[in-house]
Regions:
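Short, charged phosphate-coordinating catalytic segments
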Residues: 119-123, 190-214
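C-terminal secondary-structure termini that scaffold catalytic or DNA-interacting sites
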Residues: 353-365
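Conserved tyrosine-mediated DNA breakage-rejoining catalytic core shared by Y-recombinases
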Residues: 202-246
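Catalytic-site neighborhood detector that most strongly recognizes the C-terminal catalytic loop/helix
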Residues: 325, 329-350
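Active-site/catalytic core of tyrosine-dependent DNA strand-transfer enzymes
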Residues: 241-295
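Short, basic (Lys/Arg/His-rich) helix/loop patches that form interaction surfaces
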Residues: 284-323
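Basic, Lys/Arg- and aromatic-enriched nucleic-acid-binding interface segment
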Residues: 164-197
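N-terminal core-binding DNA-recognition domain of tyrosine recombinases/integrases
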Residues: 24-39, 48-141, 173
Length: 365
């Protein structure tokens, strides 16, 4: 990795010669130019470094994989998963081995790199183990869209994953224990907008807020002083409640002398960096302080899950929730929705009450 005026550039070097490995490095640069988030590029760099080390251990190169038959290719990539699962990718003693989902995610990144290689015309054929699949989805107005994907029949079995959420009553307790209005506004906006923490910390008070309509905008910028940025180089917006807007205005008035000295809505209100843009590390430190005071564990991502579940219970369509969260596919949104067994029984009771006569059972008794 190389830093250039706070920008990160990832590239690969040969262990012995120190020469740059061209194609993997070009792939990471392609991701950077495509406005992929730095964290995503970093994960891609690690995934590819693990795979390249695996190839070295097997005394193979990238071109060798294309020469393999189907069964050989399949064994090669499943062996990579087993190698990852055993913690062989790390030089440190792993106290906690990677789960199946993490191992699969590394391999999916490897497959994306192979696809990039093929698009660069380095190979006239594709990997034999990847098959084309199609998924049909509908947007909020019913228009169908066909998604083409590559699938691999060798991934490790994944458990059904549902991310952690937080309940409304716990959010209320956290708000009551906040040390200042900035922290209260930050929690409220996370809960009411569903924005990622990087998106919210990038909000500029003079450009990204419609004070008349009470709308907060997410604008993609890759030069924010605090390193915050929107994930998918996208533009989104969210309306906040009148009550939250009132607290927002109270916060701006309360700290206006600090806020007007720079561009960002959220700033450090005390300490050595007072008046400087608030960073993600500061948010997590604030949440840890609240956890010590209340015993309630919270994270920005848990508040995104709360947003999604609260809207689902209020009757929002899945497509609308997905768009509000900035997801590129519905599958990701579905993982946010914590549907309980009690809810399933409740909606089943309501269904049968509306449709008791659907099978004509009364006539059978």
């Amino acid at each position: 990795m190389q830093m250039d005026k706070q920008e990160k550039f990832y590239f690969f070097r040969e262990n012995e010669s120190g020469d740059i490995v061209y194609l993997p490095s070009k792939y990471l640069m392609h991701k950077k130019r495509s406005k992929i988030s730095p964290n995503t590029i970093r994960r891609s760099a690690f995934a590819l470094s693990y795979y390249l080390n695996f190839l070295d251990e097997k005394q193979l190169c990238l071109d060798d994989i294309y020469q393999m038959k189907y069964i050989e290719q399949h064994e090669h990539f499943t062996d990579f998963l087993i190698w990852l699962k055993a913690g062989m990718h790390s030089r440190e003693d792993y106290l906690k081995l990677p789960n199946n989902e993490t191992c699969n995610a590394y391999l999916k990144e490897v497959f994306r790199f192979y696809t990039f290689m093929e698009q660069e015309n380095k190979h006239s054929e594709s990997l034999k183990v990847l098959s084309d699949t199609q998924m049909i989805v509908r947007n909020s107005i019913g228009i169908r869209k066909v998604l083409n994907r590559k699938s691999f029949r060798g991934y490790l079995k994944e458990k059904g994953h549902q991310g952690k959420t937080i309940e409304q009553d716990k959010i209320v307790v956290l708000l009551q224990e906040c040390a200042n209005s900035r922290d209260q506004v930050l929690l409220l906006l996370l809960a009411e907008t569903g924005f990622r923490i990087g998106e919210l910390l990038g909000v500029r008070y003079a450009e990204d807020i419609d004070y008349e309509k009470h709308i907060i905008y997410v604008n993609f910028r890759d030069d924010n002083e605090n390193g915050a940025r929107a994930k998918n180089a996208e533009l989104r917006r969210a309306k906040i409640s009148d009550a939250t807007f009132d607290i927002l205005m109270f916060y701006i008035e309360d700290y206006k002398e600090l806020i007007i000295g720079q561009e960002y809505l959220f700033i450090n209100v005390s300490g050595d960096y007072v008046g400087k843009p608030f960073k993600g590390s500061g948010v997590y430190a604030m949440l840890r302080r609240l956890e010590r005071k209340t015993g309630i564990k919270a994270s920005p991502h848990m508040l995104r899950h709360y947003f999604a579940n609260a809207r689902r219970k209020d009757g929002w369509k899945l497509e609308m929730i997905s768009q509000a969260l900035g997801h590129r596919n519905i599958e990701t949104t579905m993982k946010y929705l914590n549907i309980t067994e009690d809810e399933l029984i409740e909606v089943s009771d309501a269904f049968y009450n509306r449709h008791q006569a659907m099978y004509g059972v009364q006539n059978l008794l």
